[in-house]
Curated annotation (Swiss-Prot):
Residues 55-64 have a biased composition (Polar residues). Residues 53-82 are annotated as: Disordered. It comes from the Viruses. GO terms for molecular function: nucleotide binding; RNA binding; RNA-directed RNA polymerase activity. Residues 286-483 form the RdRp catalytic domain. The keyword Disulfide bond does not apply. Its main location: host cell. Residues 249-256 are annotated as: Promoter-binding site. Pfam families: Flu_PB1. This is RNA-directed RNA polymerase catalytic subunit. It catalyses: RNA(n) + a ribonucleoside 5'-triphosphate = RNA(n+1) + diphosphate.
Length: 757
């Protein structure tokens, strides 16, 4: 049947149909190949925006650096990074005047955090540039490698477990004349296989010691590795994102802690809150502007867009802001906070993997690593790539590009928000000293500006003044991409405001469906997503009921667990039918065991096992949730688990769902192909680390893993704990004398082995 799609919208107000224009159904685009080209674009663009700055050379690394601060005032609308220090400082002073004590109080809060944060804070986060191996690794591994190298070079402050002490080590490491590191490498040999008599390639993983001189070490410590940002919807071109190494991360964390604390106190800041809290905050600002624009005033709102926010920001400006915000604080605190921006003004961008070349005629493929771009003959490249390489060559050192101006993506979201809000703050009548005034919202690079004035000329004058003020702080509002409306209709961080926020449901679409973790988690996450959308996103009861039915259908197809009385044949249907026939109370079977679905929109908050518990056969209960059943996963039985949801925009959200450990909460095994690669050494280290921690947990069950305090090592702590426990168990008659003696003997053997070692 043909349906005219416009009929669907006859009864829908136009603003509610906004969802349908969003590119959020289907798979998002992923990037393939290397990010080298995108990174060169970023580096070249950033330098172009600041080209009228002053060139200097870094005395330690020899890197050429461009400093656009206090550069020429712009004469046209082209984006530029020439922020003026005195203007930034003045904006900060006015921000403090409007919010008395804001910096002081935030500094005090941050100082407490600095003294309490443990170094394991840095294990959060995904891929991190590991400077010891010169490539990306999971954050925990990169941290472990860094600490190990520090230890082997005589830096041990970090062993206290405080992040601040680890940062002291980082500072010390930069003064050293050389650093010894261990790197993994691969050897390939062609050998004949005894069984098949074919030639095969054997790979062996070796570790070799390497010494880095001061210059090479500094380059690595200041390096941001780059990758292509994946899964960006609604864009044709990909772009590069950066991942910093462990030396930089800790310092950035403390700066962002201070900035976050400030943002929490600013009503115009869209960070760090999210969701409904953010909407409430925004609605307040709009309400204030609407009520104050009495009948005599006009009120207009700009849905704002900034050109290349990151590439025009400047770490030197952030240094000025931090210096101002911490001006009455102790010296050590000011020093800790000023290191991040200093490191960023000396940062190096790693160009990624390099380029792949293939010759169609000779069926040859070869990789040109980034390190070779400085010297290779350019005749092999096409025009656009040739231009990029020529432009970037003067900046190259050891395969990385010197990138002093600009702030790669996502590094100082909070601090740059403070900068943006400081301009919104200047819109008060006591600062504009005229008939127009403005206010607005800022969230990282996204903003909405509300301007009030008696007439259209006043509105225009207000917008112009805002635009020029932004230019002075290195912010470039895009005149092409920003648009203005009567207040009451605007968009901010993909929230659409039309006399109140309209649910933009399309953005939640990617999180519907089966997540693919395991049968237990997937069921729980699926119904939780539907429940959350009924609460937050105007998902009505009828649609929710339909979403639920579609989800159950999807779930059954994914896990091949159609009802026991169905005709559908799958690999599992034989087992499921057998279970169905021998089950007295069929309603008690979980959906994943071929049972019926008992969910409706009223009971989405109850985990399925609890929902059906009373209906289950006793022996089924015993199999499903019995701790003695080897198939019941007991990694940790917490009532809440976290799933990482990827909403359509913004960072991955943590979503809580109820977790009941059953035979269905299995954990998939790691892909074996990793075992044949150079990652294998890393994997073995990781497993070793895991085993030690698990063992430690067994001895100190209540411990969330913290290094035992005092001088004892982990082994000594475990041995002494074992002795105490054994004695208590022996005296209370829980264990026999033989067992007690055996435990004591083992403890002594362990100590003896340690002494010999």
């Amino acid at each position: 049947m043909d349906v005219n799609p416009t009929l669907l919208f006859l009864k829908v107000p136009a603003q509610n149909a906004i969802s349908t224009t969003f590119p959020y159904t289907g798979d998002p685009p992923y990037s393939h190949g290397t990010g080298t080209g995108y990174t060169m674009d970023t580096v070249n663009r950033t330098h172009q925006y600041s080209e009228k700055g002053r060139w200097t050379t870094n005395t330690e690394t020899g890197a050429p650096q461009l400093n656009p601060i206090d550069g020429p005032l712009p004469e046209d609308n082209e984006p530029s990074g020439y922020a003026q220090t005195d203007c930034v400082l003045e904006a900060m002073a006015f921000l403090e005047e409007s919010h008395p004590g804001i910096f002081e109080n935030s500094c005090i809060e941050t100082m407490e955090v600095v003294q309490q944060t443990r170094v394991d804070k840095l294990t959060q986060g995904r891929q991190t540039y590991d400077w010891t191996l010169n490539r990306n690794q999971p954050a925990a591994t990169a941290l472990a490698n860094t600490i190990e190298v520090f230890r082997s070079n005589g830096l041990t402050a970090n062993e206290s477990g405080r992040l601040i002490d680890f940062l002291k080590d980082v500072m010390e490491s930069m003064k050293k004349e050389e650093m010894g590191i261990t790197t993994h490498f691969q050897r390939k040999r062609r050998v004949r296989d005894n069984m098949t008599k074919k030639m095969i390639t054997q790979r062996t993983i070796g570790k070799k010691k390497q010494r880095l001189n001061k210059r090479s070490y500094l380059i690595r410590a200041l390096t941001l590795n780059t990758m292509t940002k994946d899964a960006e919807r609604g864009k044709l071109k990909r772009r590069a994102i950066a991942t910093p190494g462990m030396q930089i991360r800790g310092f950035v964390y403390f700066v962002e802690t201070l900035a976050r604390s400030i943002c929490e106190k600013l009503e115009q800041s869209g960070l760090p809150v999210g969701g409904n809290e953010k909407k409430a905050k925004l609605a307040n600002v709009v309400r204030k502007m609407m009520t104050n624009s009495q009948d005599t005033e006009l009120s207009f709102t700009i849905t704002g867009d900034n050109t290349k926010w990151n590439e025009n920001q400047n770490p030197r400006m952030f240094l000025a802001m931090i210096t101002y915000m911490t001006r009455n604080q102790p010296e050590w605190f000011r020093n800790v906070l000023s290191i991040a921006p200093i490191m960023f003004s000396n940062k190096m961008a790693r160009l990624g993997k390099g380029y792949m070349f293939e010759s169609k005629s000779m069926k040859l493929r070869t990789q040109i690593p980034a390190e070779m771009l400085a010297s290779i003959d350019l005749k092999y490249f096409n025009d656009s790539t040739r231009k990029k390489i020529e432009k970037i060559r003067p900046l190259l050192i050891e395969g990385t590009a010197s990138l002093s101006p600009g702030m790669m993506m996502g590094m100082f979201n909070m601090l740059s928000t403070v900068l943006g809000v400081s301009i919104l703050n200047l819109g008060q009548k006591r600062y504009t000293k005229t008939t127009y005034w403005w206010d607005g919202l800022q969230s990282s690079d996204d903003f909405a500006l509300i301007v009030n004035a008696p007439n259209h000329e006043g509105i225009q004058a207000g917008v112009d003044r805002f635009y020029r003020t932004c230019k002075l702080l290195g912010i470039n509002m895009s005149k092409k991409k920003s648009y203005i409306n009567r207040t009451g209709t605007f968009e901010f961080t993909s929230f659409f405001y039309r006399y109140g926020f309209v649910a933009n449901f399309s953005m939640e679409l990617p999180s519907f469906g089966v997540s693919g973790i395991n049968e237990s988690a997937d069921m729980s996450i699926g119904v939780t997503v539907i429940k959350n959308n009924m609460i937050n996103n105007d998902l009505g009861p009828a649609t929710a009921q339909m979403a639920l039915q579609l989800f159950i259908k999807d779930y059954r197809y994914t896990y091949r667990c159609h009802r026991g009385d169905t005709q559908i044949q799958t690999r599992r249907s034989f087992e499921i039918k057998k279970l169905w026939e021998q089950t007295r109370s069929k309603a008690g079977l979980l959906v994943s065991d071929g049972g019926p679905n008992l969910y409706n929109i009223r009971n989405l908050h109850i985990p399925e096992v609890c929902l059906k518990w009373e209906l289950m056969d006793e022996d089924y209960q015993g199999r499903l949730c019995n701790p003695l059943n080897p198939f019941v996963s007991h990694k940790e039985i917490e009532s809440m688990n976290n799933a990482v949801m990827m909403p359509a925009h913004g960072p991955a959200k943590n979503m809580e769902y109820d977790a009941v450990a059953t035979t269905h909460s299995w954990i998939p095994k790691r892909n074996r192909s990793i075992l044949n690669t150079s990652q294998r050494g890393v994997l073995e280290d990781e497993q070793m680390y895991q085993r030690c921690c698990n063992l430690f947990e067994k001895f100190f069950p209540s411990s969330s893993y913290r290094r035992p305090v005092g001088i004892s090592s982990m082994v000594e702590a475990m041995v002494s704990r074992a002795r105490i426990d054994a004695r208590i168990d022996f005296e209370s008659g829980r264990i026999k004398k033989e067992e007690f003696t055996e435990i004591m003997k083992i403890c002594s053997t362990i100590e003896e082995l340690r002494r010999q070692k």
